[in-house]
Regions:
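Nucleic-acid nuclease catalytic cores
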Residues: 72-119
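Domain-level recognition of nuclease-like catalytic cores that cleave nucleotide substrates
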Residues: 101-150
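Long recognition/docking surfaces used for binding and targeting
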Residues: 201, 208-313
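A conserved structural/catalytic subdomain of Rossmann-like adenosyl-cofactor enzymes
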Residues: 71, 125, 129-134, 449-684
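Conserved catalytic cores of phosphodiester-cleaving nucleases, focusing on short active-site segments
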Residues: 50-52, 59-69, 83
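Conserved S-adenosyl-L-methionine
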Residues: 324-453, 457, 465, 515-517, ...
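Active-site metal-binding core of divalent-cation-utilizing nuclease and nuclease-like domains
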Residues: 7-57
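Active-site-adjacent loop/helix micro-motif of nuclease/hydrolase catalytic cores
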Residues: 41-45, 61, 69-80, 582-583
Length: 684
């Protein structure tokens, strides 16, 4: 190994590091695994003055240090011709920087042309002495990092112009890392995902310049050279406390991270997983080496990250918390008209899980997302968003709301990339993440919130398990809330519907995913008609939620402004066969997406309820007199068997395993017991 490599350690330069050389050949660099790929014989003895590289990753730029007299206009062409072969010889290197410390030229080694950005030659100064002395400002480091990354991702043998790095979809990385953690540890799938998300947040915050120096992702990667335990100790004792400091806990005690595979419940390093931790870091670094930083994240990754991994989780399934497919969420959001609400409007998901309805509402409408742009270092959105989830003092119960907050960070990644000093981050934590999502530490969860200020819009998919609802009702009685839920029907979904209606403002709207069991309960139906205007009911196909074959519906209501108001307007009924993705374990995109046609029919209907005549065979406008006479709201039955066959609406028989069958029997038994109890109470 050369004396350079023995004596020199790389100098941190944002997410990269600078390696000062001079006497080291490319051949020696290859033997030290600093450069990858083969070398031609003619290139082996070439000696770069310095390199910019990812720690334990690839070389991104070659540095050539010259005297000022060597960088005159007359001599630059010959200097470029002589030294560009050094950078060309290094696989993946797309830029060579010539510098005298005061003046610099950024050159494409493949074409030997000066690199252009916004129509001008790139001459941003790279001063090796200032880099080694770590005398650069954060702004200067960020500018150099941005230029190096753009060159890495966009410069080629056919392109000399820099442009923004491409939008990144890290789904393959997330899947690979999740699989690795799951196979290695044997932990539940959702626990594995918590740790994927935590490392993702760590990498993202490093890439946007929030975590720098000793707190950065690159620093932890460098620590792995000294041992896996040392790297994990540094992460657990130094980095995680810094993330918690930057994003303080909310009143409920939760923040944006809480993985417990790489650390224990006390936050101490779990050395039994040090090797796995190092492997995961390397996976992230390899992805960065090939694709660039996490700064520009594809929206589809944001929207489907949690759904992809948690859809089949047994732990989630047993609680009835079926993750709503994002196509369904987005359709409900677009039907809601959230962007037209007045200033000061309140929007909620009272059973929010990882926050999909709230976050998709923010992401769908630019006018709403712009409300989260800081002004004078304060964030005061015009709308007030709330997401509630049930928990306890157990660490496992905190994780869903922590995921919701981390999910919000990912959704707002573009804003965090632009506004990321400590003051801004604390404001995002206090006024956005902690203000939006709340863990309710009680057996009642949301059902215990009876004095909440009412909402203009509620979008939700409440839990709809029947098993266990008797215990929940007992808790309601124990907390003297019987009167509040006196009119609720059977099952948790009926309690949820009672809460939703009670917590809407007069004139407020709700779009709710409900199961067929609710649509069969005459008591619930009558209560909804008494207190709300029924706008639409859309029948979703079986297996919309992969975890269950249960038939579900999108119920849309508007709370009456006058309790004596009688509905006269018709109701839009819509039947859906396909939701734009296969309804099996793969959930791959498919061409047919009836949800889009539902949105179109809904737009026309809401403009002119009495005059709308649908041409879509999946849509029906049911007069109020006819609708009011229905004893159940299984609206697909408004189509004849022949019509349903034509529309491919006849459901196939669903098979369930033994556990699923026992759950169905248990739920049915509890349902019957509640029904008998209701009848006896009415007769008493």
């Amino acid at each position: 190994m050369s004396e350079d490599l023995v004596q020199q350690q790389g100098t941190p330069l944002g997410r990269y590091e600078y390696l000062r050389l001079g006497a080291t050949t490319l051949s020696q660099l290859a033997r030290a695994s600093i450069i990858k790929g083969g070398l031609d014989d003619a290139d082996r003895q070439r000696k770069p003055d310095g390199l910019i590289l990812l720690p334990k990753g690839g070389v991104k730029a070659v540095i050539e240090i010259k005297q000022p007299q060597e960088l005159t206009a007359a001599k630059i062409p010959s200097v470029i011709k002589v030294y560009c072969p050094i950078a060309r010889a290094i696989s993946g290197c797309n830029v060579i920087i010539f510098t005298d410390g005061q003046k610099s030229l950024w050159v494409n080694p493949h074409t030997e042309n000066i690199i252009q950005y916004n129509g001008k030659s790139v001459t941003t100064v790279f001063d090796p002495k200032a880099v080694v002395a770590q005398a650069l400002s954060p702004e200067e480091i960020r500018e150099l990092n941005d230029l190096v990354e753009m060159a890495d991702q966009t410069i080629s043998a056919t392109n000399d112009a820099l442009h923004s790095a491409p939008i990144l979809d890290p789904t393959p990385l997330a899947e690979r890392v999740w699989q690795k953690i799951w196979v290695t540890t044997g932990k539940e799938p959702e626990k594995c995902l918590y740790n994927v998300v935590e490392i993702f947040v760590f990498k993202f915050l490093s890439d946007i310049g929030v975590l720098t120096g000793t707190y950065s992702f690159g620093q932890i990667v460098r620590q792995t050279k000294h041992g896996n335990d040392i790297a994990l100790d540094h992460y657990a004792s130094i980095v995680r406390p810094q993330i918690r400091k930057l994003f303080p806990k909310g009143p409920d005690g939760t923040t944006i991270i809480n993985g417990t595979i790489f650390v224990n419940e006390k936050g101490e390093a779990n050395h039994s997983q040090s090797s796995l931790f190092t492997q995961v870091l390397q996976d992230f670094q390899d992805f960065d080496d090939e694709n660039g930083s996490m700064k520009n994240i594809d929206r589809q990754f944001k929207t489907r990250l949690f759904e992809s991994f948690l859809r089949q989780s047994a732990g989630i399934k047993s609680l009835g918390q079926y993750f709503t497919p994002r196509n369904v969420v987005q359709t409900m959001v677009r039907m809601s008209g959230a962007e037209k609400l007045p200033k000061g409007a309140r929007i909620a998901d009272p059973f929010c899980g990882v926050g999909g309805f709230v976050l998709e509402t923010i992401a769908e409408f630019p006018s709403i997302q712009n409300q989260f742009v800081p002004k004078n270092k304060r964030i005061k959105p015009d709308y007030h968003f709330r997401g509630y989830d049930k928990g306890s003092d157990e660490k496992d119960d905190e994780r869903t709301i922590i995921l919701a907050k981390a999910n919000m960070l990912i959704y707002l990644s573009e804003l965090l990339s632009r506004y990321n000093d400590a003051d801004y981050l604390k404001e995002f934590a206090d006024s956005v993440f902690n203000e939006t999502f709340h863990l309710l530490r009680s057996n009642l969860g949301t059902f215990g919130l009876v004095d909440e200020e009412p909402f203009d819009l509620i979008l939700t998919n409440p839990p709809y398990v029947t098993s266990g609802s008797a215990a929940l009702r007992q808790s309601i009685r124990d907390n003297a809330l019987d009167d509040y839920y006196a009119n609720a029907g059977r099952g948790t979904e009926a309690l949820a519907m009672e809460w939703i209606i009670s917590n809407l403002k007069p004139g407020g709207r709700a779009l709710v995913v409900v199961p067929d069991g609710l649509m069969n309960q005459r008591k619930v139906i009558e209560q909804i008609k008494e207190r709300c205007i029924v706008d639409s009911i859309s029948a979703l196909p079986s297996r919309t939620f992969f975890s269950t074959p249960k038939k579900t519906y999108i119920l849309e209501v508007t709370k009456k402004t006058d309790e004596f108001e009688k509905q006269t307007t018709p109701v839009l009924a819509y039947v859906i066969t396909e939701i734009g993705e296969s309804r099996d374990a793969r959930r791959i995109p498919i061409q047919q997406n009836d949800l889009l046609d539902l949105e179109r029919a809904h737009r026309y209907f809401m403009v002119d309820k009495d005059g709308y005549v649908p041409s879509d065979p999946r849509a029906r406008v049911i007069s109020w007199d006819d609708f009011d006479g229905l004893t159940q709201w299984l609206i697909e039955r408004q189509w004849s068997v022949e019509d349903r066959k034509t529309l491919n609406l006849l459901e196939e028989r669903s098979e369930v395993d033994e556990e699923g069958f026992l759950q169905m029997v248990s739920s049915t038994l509890e349902d019957l017991q509640e029904y008998i109890s209701e009848v006896r109470n009415e007769q008493a």
